[in-house]
Each structure stands twice: as C-alpha cells, then as structure tokens.
C-alpha cells in the first residue's frame, strides 16, 4: 500500500487554480497528527504509548506526517512512524524527495531546526515557517515592509561560520480572544519584500490552519467516527493507514474536479457531504460488470 501511495499521491492544482497558488508558487503545508491503534501487544511494542497525566494512554499511537497541497487539501506525500519518532526526524526523511522548486511550504513552530531548515532549503522550495519566540534572531537589516534580515546557525557550529540568511516577520493578531497567544514570528527564505510582502506572508501563513482539518477528515469522517484503527498487528496498521491516505486522496481529487470547472475553490465543498455521496453511489458501481 505504501508503494501504491507513493505512485498515486501528488499535487493536483493546475496553475491558476483557485486557492492553490501565491504569486506563481504552489502553496503547501507540513503538519502531523497521531492516531490511536488497537491495544494489542504487538502494536504496543512497535508503536508505543504516549504519556498521560497519570501513567500512560489507553492506546498505542502511530504518528503520521503529511505534506498537503493547501488549495485542494490532498496529502501529496506522507511518512508513518511509531509515536516516539519526532516530527522533525520524520520530516528530514520525507522532505528531500518531495519538496520541489516552485513550492511555498508553510510549517508551524514545532518543525523549525537548523538542520531541517537547511534540508528543506536545499530542495529549491521556498519556505515560510513559524518559529518559537525564544529563537535568537538579531536584527541585521530592516526592510521597507517592517521585516528584517537575520542569520541562523547550527547550535553545534561554535564558530558560527556556516549560517543561513533568513527574513524575519513579527506580527500580532488584533482583537483576538486569546491575545497572549497571538504573537507570531515567521522565518522565510523569500528575502525580497517586493516579491513577497510581510503582510501577505502573514495572511498566507494562516492558510496552514486549514490543513489541520485534513487529519480530522481521515481520522473521523472517513472512518465513520471510529476513533481506533482496527488492525491488530503493526504491518496491518501501516497498510490501513496508507489505505486511508489513498481513500482521502481519491475523495479530495473528486471534489477538486467538481469545483474547478465551476470556478470554485474546493474549500467551498463539504468533505462530509462528498463521503455521503460516494457511499450512496458505491452500490451502483459494484453492479457494473467488469
């Protein structure tokens, strides 16, 4: 199933498709989630349990990392691993073969690290990642749009000789219900403010929030509200997860092909409704002879 997924999963949006592009760049987002698996000894040994406030969680968990096309919400590449694997480690395996020039990749503050940033930059993709507020980014040159240039270094580079220049965008969401949580800092390798103004990148970053719903779609809506994967061995859990990713891709592809001829952004269509329509049509498809 993994080999099939690697052949099938891909970006779908043609150039100019509504909601999929920013100044000629295909907008992508990186995000991860965890899924409960059946509480069997083999699954527990392979995937592991997350910690809990008292003891451990009731179920082992698999960690899933996905690269998502923002305009269509299709997962274009994925990595599946035991719970103990960090998202940064998984991303270091996933990104070199999947990021391409012409992409603009968004990611939240849990992903940034100098080594992963360097790996992602080497792909030729452009990046706009949120970073934690305690990351030291001294101002080196203030740009006309209020962003500024700084240099990031590997923490192991004691002599600070092999840094990379980044552009830093600081902003605060106004009139928010949670003002103490709404200070944002982005770093990007789009260094020219004329090509990507700070205000536009700040607005674009919040497209990333939408893809958090992608994992909800195949964790909940695609599985009829079942919260635990049914497979009882690690190999079958992996097959089940890749199968879910393929099913999600097929549904999202159908939604995109329904929206684009009408000039619509696929975001305007309901994933839940699409699943219901497909379920109604499946008996008809099964009746067609091969």
Predicted features by range, described:
Residues 14:
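Glycine/small-residue-rich loop that forms an oxyanion/phosphate-binding "nest" at active or ligand-binding sites
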Residues 2-8, 17, 22-26, 30-290:
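Single, function-defining residue in the core of a domain
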């Amino acid at each position: 199933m993994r080999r099939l997924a690697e052949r099938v999963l891909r970006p779908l949006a043609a150039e100019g498709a509504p909601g999929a592009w920013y100044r000629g760049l295909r907008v992508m987002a990186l995000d991860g989630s965890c899924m409960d698996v059946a509480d069997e000894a083999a699954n527990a040994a392979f995937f592991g349990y997350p910690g809990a406030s008292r003891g451990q969680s009731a179920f082992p968990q698999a960690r899933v990392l996905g690269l998502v096309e923002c305009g269509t919400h299709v997962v274009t590449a994925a990595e599946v691993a035991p719970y103990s694997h960090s998202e940064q480690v998984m991303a270091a395996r996933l990104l070199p073969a999947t990021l391409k020039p012409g992409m603009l990749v968004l990611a939240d503050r849990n992903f940034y690290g100098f080594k992963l940033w360097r790996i992602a930059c080497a792909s030729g993709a452009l990046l706009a990642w949120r970073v934690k507020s305690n990351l030291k980014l001294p101002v080196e040159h203030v740009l006309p749009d209020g962003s500024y240039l700084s240099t990031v270094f590997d923490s192991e580079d004691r002599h600070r000789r092999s840094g990379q220049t980044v552009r830093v965008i600081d902003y605060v969401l106004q009139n928010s219900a949670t003002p103490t949580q709404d200070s944002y800092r982005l770093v990007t390798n789009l260094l020219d403010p004329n090509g990507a103004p700070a205000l536009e990148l700040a607005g674009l970053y919040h497209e990333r929030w939408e893809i958090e719903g992608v994992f909800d779609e195949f964790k909940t809506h695609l599985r009829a509200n079942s919260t635990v994967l049914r497979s009882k061995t690690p190999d079958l859990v992996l097959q089940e997860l890749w199968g879910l990713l393929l099913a999600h891709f097929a549904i999202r592809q159908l939604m995109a092909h329904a929206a684009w001829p009408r000039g619509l952004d696929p975001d305007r269509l309901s994933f839940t409704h699409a699943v219901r329509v497909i379920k109604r049509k499946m008996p008809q498809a099964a009746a067609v002879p091969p």
